[in-house]
């Protein structure tokens, strides 16, 4: 049964501008150490901005699906987006603000200047 759905769209040049202006301060506030480390394999700032924009959208979409937004102590860094060996995106949570009986489905996409994410939370 579906518990909640969430979607978000991010303007990639905005993430590029913010990361250029605030650098590590912005990245460390929003992304996990693992997300930042993985991003270093991309040489281009534009490609890194796409990477970060998709993860930003995924975190926003997740809290929308959860129905709480960023409240009740949830912060961006509590949510980690990673890909499996085949490239399928997954979402991991560092705090217990969702039951382990829930299954989270995540889809990410980008096209030119926009990144999108769609999250479905299901009750097992």
From Swiss-Prot:
UniProt main location, coarse: cytoplasm
Top-level taxon of the source organism: Bacteria
Needed cofactors: Mg(2+)
Keyword Cytoplasm on entry: yes
Enzyme Commission number: 2.7.8.7
Keyword annotations from UniProtKB, A to Z: Cytoplasm, Fatty acid biosynthesis, Fatty acid metabolism, Lipid biosynthesis, Lipid metabolism, Magnesium, Metal-binding, Transferase
Localization: Cytoplasm
Protein's GO biological process: fatty acid biosynthetic process
GO-annotated molecular function: holo-[acyl-carrier-protein] synthase activity; magnesium ion binding
Cellular component terms (Gene Ontology): cytoplasm
Protein name: Holo-[acyl-carrier-protein] synthase
